[in-house]
Design a protein with these regions (language model features):
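Alpha-helical membrane-anchoring segments
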Residues: 2, 6-7, 14-355, 368, ...
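Thiol/selenol-based redox catalytic cores and closely related redox-interacting motifs
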Residues: 352-448, 462
Length: 463
């Protein structure tokens, strides 16, 4: 019979492995980093694909000279895509642009990612022309991991705004997507290094970097200032090649060790900039790899940084946004505003709860507070209506994308009129059936008395 201690030790090993697996991949952690990484992925895909659309007749339409990649796609897919009429190609172009935009802003994030991924590889199957296969292979793995879940839509997205999730940056999700993205980057670097010393690689016994330096100017190497000088020093080129090889092996280790991560991330970003400055490498390496390195930062550290910013803002003093707490539409708007106010710059205040409005600002009156939202900044500046929104767009990080639009010449003229129209027709935007005839009707209790906290008879338009 087996010794009981042997059996126990045999059981203990799988249990420890299960615990490690759970800690590494399944433990629930904030998904804030994935929301930020989504923006980098959207930018990378757009930068990779959109320039090719400027020459549709040369790249994709029936007039284009196309090449295909049978080592990447099955032949039946290549034949199917090759038969696409021009109208279908234009339709896929529109599908790609719409899905890219919705993915970037985080609207129906997972579905948008799926459609964007299919559209991207439709065009790659149509013509692979100058697009490097390696870059599309790397991008495919990243996009598939992003398609698996919608976790990247938890933060910095219209999806979180629709949910009214004030704690979106703290939302806990299984960590496996972020962990797999980390592993993708680690193994990409190690694969590149191993390829230099195996499977025909000769960086240890030969001097490939020296040969690259001496290629014609139109080759792989850019015409950077030290190129001609390096071409005259083959020994130095060999030493630089060995240094590069060692760097590609060691850099992922710096990311994996918590204490060395800051140094590893800084070196990794500098390395990508150096590659871009000296070699004609695919832009995906510069646009995607540095954000992937930032995924090694603990998401809890990102949350703590956000909370520290909120605490500093509270100590300096917040702006006050006056709204009508008896207006259902206003309450919903304030709920969305809290999602946009990541760093706690604004303190919403129901003007009904302020007995003396003039104590806040001499020009404040109940009538004005009912007619428009009012923003009172710590320096005493008071803005109302569209102008209050314009000021918010400069202060709230999640509204910064609107700032250039609302400050264009003529935007104030249009914006004030749109605001007034919304003020007059806000019942069209409210799902509550008690809102009718542009008034928030007072719901009556069984004895005929108005319910406290119900929708009041306010003409307040926008909060």
């Amino acid at each position: 019979m087996l010794d009981a201690s042997v059996v126990q030790s045999a059981i203990r090993i799988p249990q420890s492995a299960i615990q490690w697996w759970h800690q590494a991949f399944l433990v629930r952690r904030p998904s804030v980093s994935l929301g930020l990484f989504r923006l980098a992925v959207a930018f990378t895909v757009g930068a990779h694909m959109i320039p090719s659309f400027f020459e549709m007749d040369e790249n994709y339409l029936a007039t284009a000279f196309t090449t295909q990649n049978p080592s990447f796609f099955p032949l039946w897919i290549l034949r199917l895509v090759a038969g696409s009429p021009d109208w279908l190609i234009w339709s896929w172009t529109l599908v790609f642009l719409v899905s890219l935009a919705t993915f970037a802003v985080g609207l129906f994030t997972q579905a948008s990612c799926l459609v964007m991924t299919v559209a991207s590889y439709y065009f790659y199957a149509l013509n692979n022309y100058h697009i490097g296969t390696l870059s599309f292979d790397i991008l495919l793995v990243t996009l598939i991991l992003m398609c698996v879940t919608g976790f990247h839509g938890d933060f910095l997205s219209l999806d979180s705004l629709r949910r009214g999730d004030v704690r979106a940056h703290k939302r806990l999700r299984p960590f496996f997507v972020q962990r797999l993205l980390q592993q993708q980057l680690v193994w990409t670097f190690w694969y590149t290094a191993l390829n230099k010393i195996s499977a025909g690689g000769n960086w240890l016994i030969d001097n490939p970097y020296y040969y690259l330096i001496r290629y014609p100017p139109i080759g792989v190497v850019r015409d950077f200032p030290l190129r001609n000088w390096l071409g005259q020093h083959p020994t130095l080129c060999y030493q630089l090649g060995l240094t590069l090889l060692a760097f590609e092996f060691l850099l992922p280790l710096l990311w994996l060790i918590p204490r060395t991560r800051p140094v590893g991330i800084a070196l990794g970003v500098a390395f990508q900039l150096m590659l871009w400055a000296t070699l004609h490498v695919p832009t995906i390496f510069l646009f995607l790899f540095p954000p992937m390195m930032l995924l090694f930062i603990r998401p809890e550290a990102v949350v703590r940084w956000i909370e520290a910013r909120q605490a500093r803002q509270a100590a300096r003093g917040r702006a006050v946004l006056l709204y009508d707490g008896q207006c259902g539409f206003c309450l919903e708007s304030v709920k969305r505003l809290r999602v946009l106010d990541l760093f706690g710059w604004v303190d919403p205040l129901d003007f009904h709860a302020q007995p003396d409005l003039s104590a806040l600002h001499p020009s404040l009156t109940p009538e004005r507070c009912r007619s428009e939202m009012l923003l009172l900044e710590p320096n005493g500046r008071l803005s109302g209506g569209f102008y209050a929104f314009a000021r918010l767009s400069l202060r709230l990080p999640l509204l910064l994308g609107c700032a250039p639009l609302v400050h264009l010449p003529g935007a104030a003229w249009i914006g004030t009129r749109v605001y007034r129209w919304v003020a007059a027709h806000r019942d069209l935007f409210h799902r509550n059936p008690t809102c009718a005839t542009n008034q928030c009707a007072i719901r009556q209790a069984g004895n005929g008395a108005p319910l406290q906290g119900g929708a009041g008879g306010s003409s307040k338009a926008w909060s």
